[in-house]
Amino acid sequence: MSASAVRRFVAWGSVIGRALWGLIAALVFLALGGLYGGIAMLSDPSGAALGMDTVLPLLPVADFRLPGVFLVVVMGFAPLLSAFGLAVRPRWAWTAAVERLSGRSWAWTAALALGLVLSVWLAVQGTLIGFRWPIQYVTALNAALILALALAPGVRHACRRRVRG
């Protein structure tokens, strides 16, 4: 790793560092759950493998394929990309527009957006099928943690937009 890449890391021992690495951990946890649930839904679109076949009639979909794709892409791969961006801070041309608009790192913006999307996903889930499984409560706590850590002043400061040179 180059010296400039090392300088982009926030020290673990600092309060900001612990909050930032906590955000990264919460995103990885979200990704693991999204990949697990999404792959299970795609493997068995009836939902029986997850014990969710009884709620399928309550949903506006014929099977769990579409929710499975959503979970894999939005709640699986996207949080991994955001966590990578927060940890490594790559400078990619395609992320410059997001950084200009938000004034923060694209990865921070993605983490905040994922926390909001997860909150909406859980609200819709709660409306349609209720909160029946413990993992829904764990996921709700994770959504709150992602939002709280992303909005923490130190994390926001650490993720401020860097001038590209």
Q: For the regions a protein language model found, what residue spans apply to each?
A:
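Topology signature of small-to-medium multi-pass alpha-helical membrane proteins
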Residues: 2-165
